[in-house]
Amino acid sequence: MIIVVESGSTKSDWVLVNDDNEQKRFKTMGFNPFFHNETIIYNAIKYNNELCKFSKEVKAVHFYGAGCSSEELNLVVKKALAKVFINAEITVDHDLLACALATYDGSPSISCILGTGSNSCYYDGNDITENVPALGYILGDEGSGAYYGKKLLTDFLYNKLPNEIQQDFIQKFNITKADIFENTYMKPHANVYLASFMRFISDHKESEYVTNMINDGMNHFLQNHVMCYVNYKDVKVNFIGSISYIFRDNLNNQANKHNIDIGEIIKQPIDNLVNHHIKSFV
């Protein structure tokens, strides 16, 4: 029995596969070792009683997560998992590898993430190359949910939203500057808070304001995280993540302007990851 986990900063998808290739699916909060310590991760997993029923039977856990970018950070997640799945061999890898594996079709490609955060890599089937570091939601994360949420809140506080959107925002959220400051500067997980406004943004995706905002973010992402690769015009550029999927028309339009060839756009990579590991498991 194995478990494959794909975790962003907001949520984690878990798939348990038994010896007969039967699957069970679970969801937990997202785990990012930049923001979550071993205790938080362990307690969140233990809270899922249905998942933990199988903890002693699991022989391997393959975890791919946001922020799992160094041995030290990976160890935070690995220790928490080892406390739950006491008989399992545990591997922890970066979500970029999950992205690369989920979209790989046998040819080298650029793999990108547009979810709560954003990132990219070049994958040749063996090795991952990062040309530009991920700077996180304060300095970077162009085109991500946190990026757009920050833009929306900034324009709201500056009274720069179109009147219809401004009034709808006030009616739906009834929040003040103090509320926003508390959630972005004082409480943990500000990136998840910022990204939580993507549902509202999506509700107004036909408006000129949102169209321009999404297009600008996509352009910034493509310029900083795709066009940094010398051969970006010669390979497919694949995407995973809810933002790339929901706004795929905007993404394709902006990519066409730069002669970028978009390949796969996958909302959730977990199914492809499971298939990858089943092939190794059987």
Describe the residue ranges of each PLM region.
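Anionic group-transfer/hydrolysis microenvironments
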Residues: 8, 15, 66, 97, ...
